[in-house]
């Protein structure tokens, strides 16, 4: 007489995956989760990470670039920082790691990587304008986010990187950052700011904006701006080359995009953006 079989341990056994989700997790090397605010984008990114770790023998990183820092809450964690934090997943075949991008630390890492020598590195890191831009400027995280994604893919530490982005319009800004960085190094403004000192000052002095800025901010501040961009331009070659590689990564066939939305008209419109 056969013995009754025991019921599965639902607390630890992984529920079956939808076929499309299984294909997404199985074939992708990077998944970028986008959508309007308040529809569950962060929760979806976290759920995909847990599912990938449970059902596949993959090393998974879920990386949040959302300044609201909701990923830690979605996973029941006290906090996330700029370091990678292992997360225990029941019945996992693979592993799950979480991290949040700290903008200032990521910029500092990028400068240390690309500066041509220690002297320029130290001058940039000590520059007051640099500190302000990387700590307070609303779009300062856009480019370093894509750098961090590239690092995660190239490190060889992870088989799948899942990215929790800010609400849709901010996500578009992040994904467009490599192209904008390349354009910036070719811009007339950068050439003007980094021209030889005498010709730069003569040119600036003739422009109404800089005449007003000089009166309000002072010549010293304008000089600091010019110094910062002159130093930053010494890193043009490695940063532009890196931006091109990041752009290629974002359009790679192994990179997938998931748009999360709700049936609300406002959310649908935002998701379509």
Predicted features, each with a name:
Residues 2-32, 39, 44-252, 256-263, ...:
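Flexible phosphate-sensing "switch/lid" loops adjacent to ATP/NTP-binding sites
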């Amino acid at each position: 007489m056969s013995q009754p079989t025991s019921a599965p341990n639902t607390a630890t056994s992984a529920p079956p995956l939808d076929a499309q989700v299984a294909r997404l997790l199985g074939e992708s090397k990077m998944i970028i989760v986008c959508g309007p605010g308040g529809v569950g984008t962060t929760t979806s990114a976290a759920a995909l990470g847990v599912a990938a770790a449970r059902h596949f023998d993959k090393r998974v990183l879920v990386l949040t670039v959302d300044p609201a820092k909701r990923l830690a809450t979605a996973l029941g964690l006290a906090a996330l920082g700029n370091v990678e934090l292992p997360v225990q997943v029941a019945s996992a075949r693979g592993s799950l790691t979480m991290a949040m991008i700290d903008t200032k630390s990521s910029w500092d890492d990028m400068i240390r990587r690309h500066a041509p020598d220690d002297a320029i590195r130290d001058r940039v890191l000590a520059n007051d304008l640099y500190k302000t831009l990387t700590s307070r400027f609303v779009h300062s995280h856009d480019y370093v986010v894509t750098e961090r994604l590239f690092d995660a893919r190239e490190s060889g530490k992870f088989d799948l990187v899942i990215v929790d982005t800010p609400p849709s319009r901010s996500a578009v800004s992040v994904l467009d950052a490599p192209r904008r960085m390349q354009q910036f190094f070719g811009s007339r403004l950068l050439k003007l700011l980094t021209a030889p000192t005498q010709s730069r000052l003569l040119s600036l002095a003739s422009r109404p904006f800089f005449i007003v800025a000089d009166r309000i901010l002072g010549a010293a501040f304008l000089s600091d701006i010019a110094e910062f961009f002159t130093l930053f331009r010494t890193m043009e070659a490695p940063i532009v080359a890196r931006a091109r590689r990041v752009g290629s990564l974002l359009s790679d066939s192994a990179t997938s995009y998931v748009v999360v939305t709700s049936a609300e008209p406002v959310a649908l419109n935002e998701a379509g953006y």
